[in-house]
UniProtKB/Swiss-Prot annotation:
Keywords: Metal-binding, NAD, NADP, Oxidation, Oxidoreductase, Potassium. K(+) 1 binds at T26, I27, D93, V180. GO terms for molecular function: betaine-aldehyde dehydrogenase (NAD+) activity; metal ion binding. NAD(+) binds at G150, A151, W152, K176, P177, S178, E179, G230, T231, S232, T233, G254, C286, E387. This is Betaine aldehyde dehydrogenase. The record marks E248 as: Seems to be a necessary countercharge to the potassium cations. Involved in the biosynthesis of the osmoprotectant glycine betaine. Catalyzes the irreversible oxidation of betaine aldehyde to the corresponding acid. The active site is at K162 (charge relay system), E252 (proton acceptor), C286 (nucleophile), E464 (charge relay system). It comes from Pseudomonas paraeruginosa (strain DSM 24068 / PA7). Coiled coil: none annotated.
Amino acid sequence: MARFEEQKLYIGGRYVEASSGATFETINPANGEVLAKVQRASREDVERAVQSAVEGQKVWAAMTAMQRSRILRRAVDLLRERNDELAALETLDTGKPLAETRAVDIVTGADVLEYYAGLVPAIEGEQIPLRETSFVYTRREPLGVVAGIGAWNYPVQIALWKSAPALAAGNAMIFKPSEVTPLTALKLAEIYTEAGVPDGVFNVLTGSGREVGQWLTEHPLIEKISFTGGTSTGKKVMASASSSSLKEVTMELGGKSPLIIFPDADLDRAADIAVMANFFSSGQVCTNGTRVFIHRSQQARFEAKVLERVQRIRLGDPQDENTNFGPLVSFPHMESVLGYIESGKAQKARLLCGGERVTEGAFGNGAYVAPTVFTDCSDDMTIVREEIFGPVMSILVYDDEDEAIRRANDTEYGLAAGVVTQDLARAHRAIHRLEAGICWINTWGESPAEMPVGGYKQSGVGRENGLTTLAHYTRIKSVQVELGDYASVF
């Protein structure tokens, strides 16, 4: 028996039954418990959501900037009031430790919404003088109805990162959460409605990407798609979105990010950064620094410091506030990660720790994989080339700066990169040469609301967060005004 009642769709400011009659289950990865049956949206439901969004967006866009700003600020207050309640639900659905979801997931999502709520009155056009009797002015107008397609690793945070700039700019959004972790997006929809967002401005459709996601990307009344997920799926979404009606797209895709530790680095700090960059959220973070480059002279000392920190990781029940490392998000994903680990062993990477499923006692009922560190890795190994999205660190040895940067850039991905060094000139020189959209110097992982994030190469298109993202949820209308006579050539 499921823990929660059957979950419906959220359309037009309320829960509605899916017309398909079909459902799927969402599972607690810590113990295999069925959390809820979730209704699967049909094409008819997509059409209902689009029509609701079209009508709601007209009401929303007609409000003054300050009215929209106040409503979004009210939603921020509600999110913060219910932080612990939402965090508990996120922990059940994702398997992330409660200590993590309380401190990060809802907090960082609310921060982004607060940031954009404050920017609503600052959306403005330009006035461009041409001559004494003529000038041009521009208007930044909302796109209309947009769609967000989320990933399973940060369900409510991603829903907020996508909806906050969209709604701030006067758009309506239809959001499709991952079918692996769909629960908190529905709660966000409730909060938006309670805060005063007009009916239809934020709708949630649950279901598969192959069906619901595809129908959204193809719909002619949807003006933009914002997608977070794997690169192969992102390519399909982008192709469908552009071929159907030349939609704008934002793609936050995969990564295989390099972390370069230079010989002068503080190795304690470097080990702290490397462990956080690989094992936070059980390694299920798109920006993880999974390729760790260490200078040959420092390899043994660095490995010892990494192992010392891995031994301090508190793997356990996500509900236990002492736990800081939980299960992977699902059993199928666990099998995928274990497959990569076996590949690393087969290709002769040297295993320093982990490398297996954790099955002791109650852990055997969950999707637990031990924190895993491989060393003596080579650039052609599968664990070094492909995104694993799990707790697997690959340590690679280099001899000089040019070699490290060349090898760091030798990937189809370009999401993130980082360096650890006490030499400020070297830090900036290296960062400027690294082919990645998000870079860190002597730190890793923080993505504040003010910071545009997104990738180079096959890690994405466009950005999320920051001022630039708000602009991309608007379109510019240019208007020329002539105050003098009009001279016709005829």
